[in-house]
Design a protein with these regions (language model features):
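Beta-sheet entry/capping signal
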Residues: 8, 48-50, 73-75, 118-120, ...
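A short C-terminal boundary segment appended to hydrolase-like catalytic domains
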Residues: 106-160
């Protein structure tokens, strides 16, 4: 990939609480919109931006846009192995919460908060292959892969 790979402890994308148009997490980038815009201004200088994000405990694929709706890049949020994810916290409300995030946040293209796992990333000149791998248990050294979701991200191209 010809561009910039950025690591972030927290989601950079703008997340709103459904219907309220208020920041989801003011202790993350949501609480620092001016600083996020300064970061985006620098990232706009790069041909293609791919952000790897952790500490959300769920899987995400997000398009990043600045305040003027200019495409900045794609953000990949990796799932947790042992930390609580959406289903651990909200149980049967998980599907509704995930659907709400996608509906209310145009930049969120996909999310998964039901399974534990990890993310594999293969970078080539033409694309980034993102594979979210989920396991049936994290309480044993013996586990099975129960699902994997693959996505191809093209340089400087929003996820549709």
């Amino acid at each position: 990939i010809n561009g910039c790979l950025v690591g972030s402890e927290m989601c950079i994308r703008d997340r709103k609480i459904g219907g309220a148009n208020v920041p989801f997490n003011t202790d993350a980038w949501d609480g620092y919109p001016k600083e996020r815009e300064r970061l985006f201004k620098e990232l706009k200088k790069v041909n293609s931006v791919l952000v790897l994000t952790g500490d959300t405990h769920n899987s995400w694929l997000n398009n990043l846009y600045d305040a003027n709706n200019n495409f900045i890049g794609v953000e990949i949020g990796t799932p947790a192995i042992s930390s609580p994810n959406t289903i651990d916290t909200f149980g049967s409300l998980t599907d509704r919460i995930e659907e709400g995030f996608i509906k209310e946040n145009k930049n969120v293209k996909w999310t998964e908060g039901k399974h534990k796992g990890y993310t594999l990333l293969k970078l080539t000149k033409d694309r980034s292959e993102v594979c979210f791998v989920y396991v049936n248990t994290v309480k044993s050294k013996v586990y099975e892969v129960i699902d994997n979701n693959k996505f191809n991200v093209k340089p400087n191209t929003p996820i549709i």
